[in-house]
Amino acid sequence: MAAKDVKFSTDARDRMLRGVDILANAVKVTLGPKGRNVVIEKSFGAPRITKDGVTVAKEIELEDKFENMGAQMVREVASKTADLAGDGTTTATVLAQAIVKEGAKSVAAGMNPMDLKRGIDLAVDAIVADLKAHAKKITSNDEIAQVGTISANGDNEIGRFLAEAMQKVGNEGVITVEEAKSLDTELEVVEGMQFDRGYVSPYFVTNSEKMRVELEDPYILIHEKKLSGLQTMLPLLEAVVQSGKPLLIVAEDVEGEALATLVVNKLRGGLKIAAVKAPGFGDRRKAMLEDIAILTGGTTISEDLGIKLENVTLSMLGRAKKVVIDKENTTIVDGAGAKKDIEARTQQIKLQIEETTSDYDREKLQERLAKLAGGVAVIRVGGATEVEVKERKDRVDDALHATRAAVEEGILPGGGVALLRATKVLDGVKTANADQKAGVDIIRRAIQVPVRQIVQNAGEDGSLVVGKLLEKDTYSWGFNAATGEYQDLVQAGVIDPAKVVRTALQDAASVASLLITTEALVADKPKKAEATQAAPAMDF
């Protein structure tokens, strides 16, 4: 086992604090609408330019192991906030730095770290309750666009695209962000349910110009096994022909005689038909087939349920307004499933999302939920250079998470004002002793720091602005760093999602409390470099 280096009390906290400062000082310059860029060297390719706090935090690794511990714990604040709220990482880092700094001073002055922590927890609970009480639910598309714009560092175009995407696919819909091949940013919306399986044979194509199958008002047969012969299906096919409607077959596979017969019938014009393979694999395939059945109002033809293909009637088939199939994807638009069944299914998937511990499973469940709830939107981010595209994509990702958070828990005035206004609530917090009161005061000073930093990054005097803001009682009145004016921030569109502000404060206080109550640090001792032996002489 390698020898360890151990540091105690003040020495340990000082080392950690240095690491906290290095990381937080690099991150906090990105805060606010006038936040500066940070350039990160990459071992290959062009350097990366970003204004995203968590991206900067993840790149920082310090040589001194004790300093690095402090830096990594604050990095954890940024990562946790990014995971939970998707934005607010820089605010969380700035808050953590402020709480640790103030806390370290109090501990050095001889106060009890555990009582300080209790005081911090009491203050945070009071502020969270205040934030929830003041949060305003989002009602209009404009407000969604404003949240997106603020999170994207004032980029109106990004805010507009996000609002449009959320309007089209709903709050539960999947919105993905990709890099575009062109200069322009564009939005593509796939309405209805889309899955990544194309037609089994190109002979099914009805639109030869676009090489795709288009079926209007079709019946949909959902079968979980392979189809290799059509003998058992003949009664059903005859009923479909008589109805005059097209038929889509979704099965594990369609092969051999079955495929040949279907293609021949299609080419002769007797039967408008197409076949696709079922999406997914294993248990996920069963679940996705059931989703399609519920969406279209049909029944999954499965031997588990005791339904044989020869007994299937038209009433067991699903219906949709339109189905479009190309080489790679199938899209079912406007399925005829009962609304209450679809809602029950989405509720069931939501419960599974809450219970699952696997990130991969969660992602797949969210995709299924979105397909049932209304569709998928893709925002393709354009730019003149690869560096610019990557930087914009970072901002779009941030903005997307922020808008989702805003829809979830409502909005608050931005610019750090919501936290600043919460100082009043702290006057009513009851503490058991002087050290706990000092913990409350640590938070009182820390929640002023985001406003100061935003103002400082905009080139103004932070203390002056904070003093001016505290003179006035109006909750949403604040300093708009983008324009340099004092105004009602909610009316001006300077807003933050309540979830982002709340998560940033809770995560910062949680990790900062741990740093304050740390009494010893243990790290591996650096190994001394062994002297290399001289190479033997080569005088042959």
Curated annotation (Swiss-Prot):
InterPro entries: Chaperonin_Cpn60_CS (IPR018370), Cpn60/GroEL (IPR001844), Cpn60/GroEL/TCP-1 (IPR002423), GroEL-like_apical_dom_sf (IPR027409), GROEL-like_equatorial_sf (IPR027413), TCP-1-like_intermed_sf (IPR027410). SUPFAM superfamilies: GroEL apical domain-like, GroEL equatorial domain-like, GroEL-intermediate domain like. GO terms for molecular function: ATP binding; ATP-dependent protein folding chaperone; isomerase activity; unfolded protein binding. The keyword ATP-binding applies. Its EC number is 5.6.1.7. It is found in: Cytoplasm. It catalyses: ATP + H2O + a folded polypeptide = ADP + phosphate + an unfolded polypeptide. It comes from the Bacteria. ATP binds at residues 30-33, 51, 87-91, 415, 480-482, 496. Keywords: ATP-binding, Chaperone, Cytoplasm, Isomerase, Nucleotide-binding. One of its GO terms (biological process) is protein refolding. It is an enzyme of class 5 (isomerase). One of its GO terms (cellular component) is cytoplasm. Its main location: cytoplasm. HAMAP family: CH60. Forms a cylinder of 14 subunits composed of two heptameric rings stacked back-to-back. Interacts with the co-chaperonin GroES. Belongs to the chaperonin (HSP60) family. Together with its co-chaperonin GroES, plays an essential role in assisting protein folding. The GroEL-GroES system forms a nano-cage that allows encapsulation of the non-native substrate proteins and provides a physical environment optimized to promote and accelerate protein folding. This is Chaperonin GroEL 3. It comes from Bradyrhizobium sp. (strain BTAi1 / ATCC BAA-1182). The gene is groEL3.
